[in-house]
Regions:
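N-terminal domain-start signal
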Residues: 1-85, 89-93
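A contiguous, surface-oriented mixed alpha/beta subdomain in the mid-to-C-terminal portion of proteins
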Residues: 71, 87, 96-209
Length: 209
């Protein structure tokens, strides 16, 4: 792995406040908690969120699942780490809920003559391998050094999914548990792929907030 980059982000809250603030309506506080959880999942703490706090959060995620913290990312902008992780989380949840559907759409897209955003010839990896890497990221098994690669691979997968006959639509039913402004917007898969590409580039140079 490359030498770890020092991320640029808002000041983290202390561990007790991060645990207690779920559901807080204060946007600044919610954003701070989202950043705390996201960077801690990557193994990054600071003077107020110690290595022990980080280890405890990662262990909680590994034993109880990323759902325990993911919801605090749902309002985060796409150009931030929590925003990028939220988008990857939505892909993760979709894949694990509907594995056959997602696999079929990926296979369909892989046969498309043109995959928007990918230059021909396109060498595609099995979707299962990409999702294993996404799972590792969301379990806290990876670090911020892995962000560029995993976010980029998630973006490529979304471009392939959008290339088939079903197009770039993602979630259409507003009653779907995965219905969100990210998943229900026009050309949702492609727009999200673009956002993840930007986040990957920012991660590569250590400027992902």
């Amino acid at each position: 792995m490359a030498q770890s980059k020092m991320p640029r982000r808002p000041a983290m809250l202390d561990a007790a406040r991060a645990d207690a603030i779920v559901g807080d309506e204060d946007p600044a506080a919610t954003a701070a908690v989202a950043h705390t959880a996201a960077w801690a999942l990557m193994g990054v703490g600071d003077e107020t969120f110690t290595d022990a706090d980080v280890a405890r959060l990662r262990e909680t995620v590994r034993t109880s699942g990323v759902d325990t913290i993911a919801h605090v990312w749902s309002r985060s902008p796409e150009f931030t780490l929590p925003g990028a992780l939220w988008r990857v989380y939505l892909l993760h949840e979709w894949y694990h809920r509907d594995p056959l559907l997602v696999a079929e759409r990926y296979a369909d897209g892989s046969r498309a003559p043109i995959i928007q955003g990918l230059e021909a010839p396109v060498e595609l990896r099995p979707l299962s391998l990409i999702m294993e890497e996404v799972d590792s990221l969301l379990r806290g098994d990876l670090t911020d050094d892995d962000l560029e690669y995993v976010l980029g691979e998630a973006s490529r997968a979304m471009r392939v999914l959008a290339a088939g006959e079903a197009g770039a639509l993602w979630i259409e039913d507003p009653a779907d548990p995965l219905a969100h402004r990210v998943t229900m917007r026009h050309s949702a898969l492609l727009v999200t792929a673009d956002e993840l590409d930007v986040a990957a580039r920012e991660a590569a140079v250590g400027t992902l907030d």
